Structures are given as C-alpha cells and as structure tokens.
Regions:
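Predominantly the structural core of cysteine protease catalytic domains
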Residues: 1-92, 97-127
Length: 127
C-alpha cells in the first residue's frame, strides 16, 4: 500500500482557517469509516478527528510513537489526521513536540475504530 502524507505542521500559522467552514464527514465506527477518511484525505488538506483517549496516549514517545490502548478512559480529544499507510493513520497532536515523534504518532486502524468519536474536514481555506 502506498503511504499518503499531507502537510500538517505543529508550528504552522493557522490564520488560513479564519473563514474555513467545518463539514462533518462521519461519526460511526465501521471499516467504511477508515476508507472514507482516506478518500477525504486525498481531497482535503485538513482533517480532524475526535477520540475517546486513554492512558496509553501518555506512553507515546520519540522511541515508541505508535499509539496503544492502555488503562482508563480520559475523555475526548481532537487531533489532525495527516496521512496513512498500512500500519494506520499518521496524526499530529497539538500537545507539542514532546508527544510521540515531534508531535506525530501512528494510530493503528483497530485503535482508530475503538476510540473514534467523530471526524470533520474543513473547506473554504484561504492560504
């Protein structure tokens, strides 16, 4: 499978989002959700998804940047989806560069379906 990576930078100026319109694209937990997210990632620059995260998110580091489920639920949190490959989605977390690999992590598809709450894409972006 080919990897697809979009531009997502933790240090990017987000003024281009000022007039953006949010479009919800899914809120179910099926394998079709994964395929829909991949299709939309090809068409749009900016995807966000909300997850019911757990303690395993705090284990994500430079050495271990693949998310794993662990412990109790900590509530909802949104991240940017930047790409995917055969291992899962590449995400950018806004917790800073101390999270995962300089702010990035891989979210395996099974964990995506387990913790997924909603997804959205933005239109009318002015760069």
């Amino acid at each position: 499978m080919n990897a697809v990576i979009k531009l997502c930078r933790a240090d990017k100026e987000f003024s281009f989002l000022d007039n953006a319109e949010v479009k919800t694209f899914f809120n179910d937990k099926t394998s079709g959700t994964i395929e829909l997210a991949k299709q939309l990632l090809h068409k749009h620059d900016f995807l966000q998804a909300g997850f019911n995260i757990d303690e395993g998110w705090y284990d994500c580091s430079q050495v271990n940047y693949v998310l794993k489920a662990r412990g109790r639920s900590l509530g909802g949190h949104a991240v940017n989806i930047c790409g995917y490959d055969s291992d899962g989605f590449y995400i950018l977390n806004q917790w800073g560069t101390g999270f995962g690999s300089k702010g990035y992590a891989v979210m395996p598809y099974d964990l995506f379906l387990k913790q997924f709450m909603y997804g959205a894409y933005l239109t009318n972006l002015k760069y």
